[in-house]
Amino acid sequence: MGKFDGILLLSDLDGTLLSGTRVISPENLEALRYFMAEGGRFSVATGRSKPGMEHFLEYLPINAPVVIYNGAVVYDFEAGRAVWQRPLGERGLDLYHLVQTEFPGTGMETYEMDIAYALSDNPISRRHFTNVKMPWKLVGPEEVPQPWVDMLLLEQEDRLAKIKARLEEQFPGKFFLQYSDKEFLEVLHPEANKGTAALALCEYLGISSENLYTVGDGRNDIQLLTCTKNAYAPANAEPEVKALCPRMLPHHEDHAIAALIAELDAAR
């Protein structure tokens, strides 16, 4: 029996597990290896796509399926299959036509499991694809096979707020809308978010939700942090996250995950 048998630790990537240069510190790496050697299950919950996540697997110590696409999919990279998913599907078409008509010039991305598409591009969307190192192509919506996993709207902050308000007015309850950055608005199936996916992962692994520990810093981590009583945030977390009063950890540049594992270790 290991110290951490029956525990699932689920962390956000950027701003939480990774440094500002998008690497994992030796301190976090050593702590995670110890955590898993003592029976703990560790994975991440990220807005990244399946291809965008794959290159991290070379150096991230993960021993459980991964929550990707901000909670639309739980993917087992070892088995090569999704173990749970709530894709956006054809409902994204209505949203596309409204945004294209009323807010022309807005960047719109959508995804199959392995491929990224730009339905409409702008400087923000082009910069996004460059940053995440994903190949993409500009296409019409009819060229993207169904089901779409999710959509991402990319626009200046003030205009994006107007788009969000208009979508909520036109399509009440049809989508889960969530900022992942001030210029990024995620559009998901209404049952898709990091928290729902985290609980689905617990069920898949046979781990009680009482033993789920989550860590995140951004607005797209709110459901991840409210789905369990064991929620933590690094000191650099956004104000909306800090307002939830999760337990606070050091800044993500100061090895927040290692600090959490040390806390769990001391309690056992």
Residues of each region from the PLM?
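Asp-based phosphoryl-transfer active-site loop
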Residues: 5-21, 225
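Active-site phosphate-binding/coordination module
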Residues: 21-125
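Residue-level signal for inorganic ion chemistry
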Residues: 35, 70, 151, 225, ...
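Short active-site oxyanion
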Residues: 39-43, 62-64, 150, 210-211, ...
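Phosphate- and divalent-cation-binding pockets in alpha/beta enzyme and binding domains
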Residues: 52-55, 162, 197, 223-224, ...
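Short, structured coil segments at secondary-structure junctions
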Residues: 60-62, 69-70, 78, 171-173, ...
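Conserved acidic, metal-coordinating active-site core of Asp-based
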Residues: 102-215, 219-227, 236
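Asp-based, Mg2+/Mn2+-dependent phosphohydrolase catalytic module
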Residues: 227, 231, 235-268
